[in-house]
C-alpha cells in the first residue's frame, strides 16, 4: 500500500517537494531557491524554466533521499504562488515570456483606466475581486500585446495560459493535461465565482481568447498522471489549490467563521464564510476557499504584499541582520519610548486600501532611532496590517464579531515576538499549530482525500494540534494608541498619493 503523498509547493522564492505520511507529518523535504528578476521599477519576473527545473529537481531529490519510488506514492498534490502568470506554446511547453509574478505592478495604469471607465462593478460582481495589477487578467493582456504574434497564435489555439499550477501540470503530464482548479481560477479576474465558469464578458473586456484558458476542476480531482519517463512510472495527480487556500485546508478551517493567516513573503488572511459568497464593503476580496465534489466554499480574503519581505529588506537592503531569525532578538531590544512606524508599501498597499501607487515610509524617527527600533517597526508593520484585515472582516460578515482566534502559519509565524505582538494588537488569541507546514499539508490532504488516503474533512480536522497559544498582554489604552498611530501614518501616505 502506498505510504505517502508527494506534495509540490511552488512558492515565490523557492520550490519544494515533500513526502507526507498518513498522520500528516513530513517524512522528507527537498527545497531549491528560485531566482527573481526585476527588469524595471515595479516589475517582477521569473524564468518559466527555473520554475519547472527546480520543481522537477526537488521531486527527484526527495524520492531519492527517502528511498521510495512511484509505487510508494498514492498521489501528487500541487500548491503554488497564485496569480503569477505564464503563457506557453502547447506544442513545446515553452513559455513565450518570463512569468509575470503576482507582486508585479506594471499594469497599474491599465487597471486605473479600467476603473475610471466604470468596469469595477462588473468585475467585482462576477469575480469577487477588485481591479488590481495583482491578479492575472491584465498580466495576460500585457503578454499578448508585448510578444509579437502572440495574440494571433492565442486565437488559433497554439498558446496556453496558466497560473503556476496549470503550467506545472502541463509539464508533469507531458503536455496531455491543460487544467487548473477553482481556487487558482478565482484569482485571474476572468472567472465567475458564482457560476464556476470563465466569463465571456470579462474575456472580451481584457481581450483574452477563450482558446488560451485551462479547464477548471475541483481541488480534489483526477488531474491525470505524470509522464512515465519523469519518475520511472506514472504517478497520479489528484489535488491542487493556490497556496493560501491550501493553507486554509491544512489549518482545518472548514467551519464558517474560522480564520487563518499565512505569513510568507506577503501575508494573507482568509475567513471561511461557508457556501455563500459575502460581498465586502471594506475592500476585501471574495474568493473560493476550496471546491470539493462540485460544492464551493467561499472566503473573505485580505492580502498584504509585504510581510516576510520586510525582514528581507532589513537583511538584504539595510544589511542590519545576517539571518531573518535575528530580527526577533533585535526587535526585543527596541526602546519602548520610541514609536517608530514603518508602512512597508514597497510595491503599493494591499487590502483594505488597494493603493498600488503608494510607496513606503518611516514615521517617528529621532536621533536615537537605531537598528532595534527599525527591526521592531518592520515586525509590527505585519501585525498592524493584519489588524486592518481582521477589522474589515468583522465589519463585513455578520457572523464575525468580537475577539477572533487566529490560526497562523508560514515562515514568519515562527517569530515569537511577532506572534505575541500580533495577539497584543488584535486583542485576541493567536494559535500556532504543531505542524507549521500547513500549505503543504493542505495540498497533500486534497490529493489524499481524492484517493481515500486521508479521511473526510470533519475527521481530518480532529487531528489539528496546537503548539502554542499567544494571548494578549497589552493594555487596551496602549493598543488603541498604537493602532491610531499606524492608521495616521497610512492616511498620511494615502493623502500624498
From Swiss-Prot:
InterPro entries: ATPase_NBD (IPR043129), Carb_kinase_FGGY (IPR000577), Carb_kinase_FGGY_CS (IPR018483), FGGY_C (IPR018485), FGGY_N (IPR018484), Glycerol_kin (IPR005999). Keywords: ATP-binding, Glycerol metabolism, Kinase, Nucleotide-binding, Transferase. Inhibited by fructose 1,6-bisphosphate (FBP). One of its GO terms (biological process) is glycerol catabolic process. It comes from the Bacteria. Signal peptide: none annotated. ATP binds at residues 12-14, 265, 308, 312, 411. ADP binds at residues 12, 16, 265, 308, 411. Glycerol binds at residues 82-83, 134, 243-244. Sn-glycerol 3-phosphate binds at residues 12, 82-83, 134, 243. Pfam families: FGGY_C, FGGY_N. One of its GO terms (molecular function) is ATP binding. Its EC number is 2.7.1.30. Pathway: Polyol metabolism; glycerol degradation via glycerol kinase pathway; sn-glycerol 3-phosphate from glycerol: step 1/1. GO terms for cellular component: cytosol. It is an enzyme of class 2 (transferase). Key enzyme in the regulation of glycerol uptake and metabolism. Catalyzes the phosphorylation of glycerol to yield sn-glycerol 3-phosphate. NCBIfam families: glycerol_kin, PRK00047.1. Belongs to the FGGY kinase family. This is Glycerol kinase. It comes from Xanthobacter autotrophicus (strain ATCC BAA-1158 / Py2). The lineage of its organism: Bacteria, Pseudomonadati, Pseudomonadota, Alphaproteobacteria, Hyphomicrobiales. The gene is glpK.
Amino acid at each position: 500500500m502506498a505510504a505517502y503523498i508527494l506534495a509540490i509547493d511552488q512558492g515565490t522564492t523557492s520550490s519544494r517537494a515533500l513526502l507526507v505520511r498518513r498522520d500528516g507529518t513530513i517524512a522528507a523535504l527537498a527545497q531549491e531557491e528560485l531566482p527573481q528578476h526585476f527588469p524595471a521599477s515595479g516589475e517582477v519576473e521569473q524564468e518559466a524554466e527555473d520554475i519547472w527545473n527546480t520543481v522537477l529537481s526537488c521531486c527527484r531529490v526527495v524520492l531519492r533521499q527517502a528511498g521510495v519510488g512511484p509505487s510508494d506514492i498514492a498521489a501528487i498534490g500541487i500548491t503554488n504562488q497564485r496569480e503569477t502568470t505564464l503563457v506557453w506554446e502547447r506544442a513545446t511547453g515553452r513559455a513565450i515570456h518570463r512569468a509575470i509574478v503576482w507582486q508585479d505592478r506594471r499594469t497599474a495604469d491599465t487597471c486605473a483606466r479600467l476603473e475610471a471607465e466604470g468596469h469595477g462593478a462588473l468585475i467585482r460582481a462576477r469575480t469577487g475581486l477588485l481591479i488590481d495589477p495583482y491578479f492575472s487578467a491584465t498580466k495576460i493582456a500585457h503578454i499578448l500585446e508585448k510578444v509579437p504574434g502572440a495574440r494571433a497564435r492565442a486565437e488559433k489555439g497554439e498558446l496556453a495560459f496558466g497560473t503556476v499550477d496549470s503550467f506545472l501540470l502541463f509539464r508533469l503530464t507531458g503536455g496531455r493535461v491543460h487544467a487548473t482548479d477553482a481556487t487558482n481560477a478565482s484569482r485571474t479576474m476572468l472567472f465567475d465565482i458564482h457560476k464556476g465558469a470563465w466569463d465571456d464578458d470579462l474575456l472580451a473586456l481584457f481581450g483574452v481568447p477563450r482558446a488560451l484558458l485551462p479547464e477548471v476542476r475541483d481541488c480534489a480531482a483526477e488531474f491525470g498522471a505524470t509522464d512515465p519517463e519523469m519518475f520511472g512510472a506514472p504517478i497520479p495527480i489528484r489535488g491542487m489549490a493556490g497556496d493560501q487556500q491550501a493553507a486554509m485546508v491544512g489549518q482545518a478551517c472548514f467551519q464558517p467563521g474560522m480564520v487563518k493567516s499565512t505569513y510568507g513573503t506577503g501575508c494573507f488572511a482568509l475567513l471561511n464564510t461557508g457556501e455563500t459568497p459575502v460581498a465586502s464593503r471594506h475592500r476585501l476580496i471574495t474568493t473560493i476557499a476550496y471546491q470539493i465534489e462540485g460544492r464551493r466554499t467561499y472566503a473573505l480574503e485580505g492580502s498584504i504584499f509585504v510581510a516576510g519581505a520586510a525582514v528581507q529588506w532589513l537583511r538584504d537592503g539595510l544589511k542590519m541582520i545576517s539571518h531573518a531569525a535575528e530580527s526577533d532578538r533585535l526587535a526585543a531590544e527596541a526602546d519602548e519610548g520610541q514609536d517608530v512606524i514603518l508602512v512597508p508599501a514597497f510595491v503599493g498597499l494591499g487590502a483594505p486600501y488597494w493603493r498600488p501607487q503608494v510607496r513606503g515610509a518611516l514615521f517617528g524617527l529621532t536621533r536615537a532611532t537605531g537598528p532595534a527600533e527599525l527591526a521592531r517597526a518592520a515586525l509590527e508593520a505585519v501585525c498592524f496590517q493584519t489588524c486592518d484585515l481582521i477589522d474589515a472582516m468583522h465589519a463585513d460578515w455578520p457572523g464575525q464579531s468580537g475577539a477572533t482566534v487566529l490560526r497562523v502559519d508560514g515562515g514568519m509565524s515562527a517569530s515569537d515576538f511577532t506572534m505575541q505582538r500580533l495577539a497584543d494588537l488584535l486583542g485576541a488569541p493567536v494559535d500556532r499549530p504543531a505542524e507549521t507546514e500547513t500549505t503543504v499539508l493542505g495540498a497533500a490532504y486534497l490529493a489524499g482525500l481524492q484517493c481515500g488516503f486521508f479521511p473526510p474533512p470533519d475527521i481530518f480536522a480532529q487531528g489539528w494540534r496546537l503548539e502554542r497559544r499567544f494571548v494578549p498582554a497589552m493594555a487596551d489604552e496602549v493598543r488603541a494608541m498604537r493602532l491610531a498611530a499606524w492608521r495616521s501614518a497610512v492616511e498620511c501616505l494615502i493623502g500624498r498619493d
